[in-house]
């Protein structure tokens, strides 16, 4: 049932994208693509690749000034036969009185699909504000049927970034809390720097992440430093 629901929502998002794209003129549609490699695919403090490297990539489309949608994929390793994660997402973003807002839906699908409880959907809402070189924001993600369970979950996050005087170099970090209805809640945080190489599509992000999960049985939640090299076209 989770797979059918997630697939249906992904299809609805795709139809909405096509409808919006059809209503817009060609110059209102922008398409970008990205591909990258990371030393460890980390999501909310947990390694999704069993602390091994991952290859990732996606395509994004923006229609007009507000509607966006895209698809993104990465290899994963949960110690079973699951090999890939595919995210399909869409939403609307805009600006009001100096605040940037973003509301959307993200569908997480896992292949080859033997573990259908992995698939889930999240509703997203985020607000941020830029003051000079500093941008601060808050975001919330709610899933009625979270990863690996049949229960709801909520993730809340405070984040900030700083565009340094060095051209192309920014520093960013976030503190979040994952509330789970099937197990203990946990906190996670990260801090890192991103450098965009001038005249190229390349950027390099180096980041430290950790959680307050203290269990030898869950080594994928330990503190770690990982690096991601990405090209955006």
Where are these regions (language model features)?
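Cleavable N-terminal export/targeting peptides
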Residues: 1-30
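Short glycine/proline- and aromatic-enriched beta-strand/turn motifs that initiate or cap beta-hairpins
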Residues: 26-77
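Residues that define the transmembrane beta-barrel architecture of outer-membrane proteins
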Residues: 29, 51-55, 82-86, 99, ...
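Repeated loop/turn-to-beta-strand initiation elements of outer-membrane beta-barrel proteins
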Residues: 31, 65-71, 98-103, 132-138, ...
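Transmembrane beta-strands of outer-membrane beta-barrel pores
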Residues: 37-43, 73-77, 94-96, 107-111, ...
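Surface-exposed loop and membrane-interface regions of Gram-negative outer-membrane beta-barrel proteins
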Residues: 47, 67-96, 101-117
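Outer-membrane beta-barrel architecture
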Residues: 58-60, 89-91, 124-128, 157-161, ...
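Outer-membrane beta-barrel "beta-signal"
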Residues: 191, 195-197, 219-233
